[in-house]
Amino acid sequence: VYLSMGGDKIKDARRLAEEVIDCGKFALVNYEKSLNTDEANKDLLFSDEHIFSLRGQNVKSDAEGVHKQITGTDGNVQMASGYQSILYLGDLEDYRLNWYKSFYIIKYTSDNSERFFPKMPMIRLSEMYLIAAEGWMEDDPEHAAELLQTLKQARTKSIVNKQTVTEEMILLEMRKEFVGEGQLFYVYKRLNHDIIGNTSEDGVKASNSVFVLPLPEEEIEYGYRN
């Protein structure tokens, strides 16, 4: 909320995010340990990072109805090769690529998903790192880079050390991190950023017609909104 408010409230956002990071109750997944875990024990939901999640027995079946065709072999939510190149920049070591199988998302539908109890993450530790990094981006770019680096080390071994952080770098991690969680639209809206498509040419330009809901006709007529 503070991050969306902007201005001096950004300082509150980064302070509270780092309080969660430093509290010791949550931990980022270990990349090497996750990579070397057999398929039956892979936790694609990153459960240890969940600060708050919604649980329900129908998460898997509901996700199957959205993320893949029950009667076919292909998914109806596809990651085109062009989008993968834009998103991962050729980094095939990123553990989050395990969320995709045969072009559909298996984040919530993998065979072992019920082992970790069906759930939908609402707030995760990784989000705290991204909030803190964005909050420090202008005032202390080196610290922001350290935060982003720590998160990336939990996701891939292909790390390039950076001394600074840009909005585009943070947005790129958000796009990789929030797959299937319904967050990205609101990130694009908050930043008034173009929505990225499968290629750099087929996205949606940021505008009020995309991000601002029109007033109902009754509100205009009876609410003195002209």
Regions found by a protein language model. Give the residues of each.
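Acidic/polar-rich alpha-helix caps and helix-coil junctions
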Residues: 1-68, 74-79, 84-226
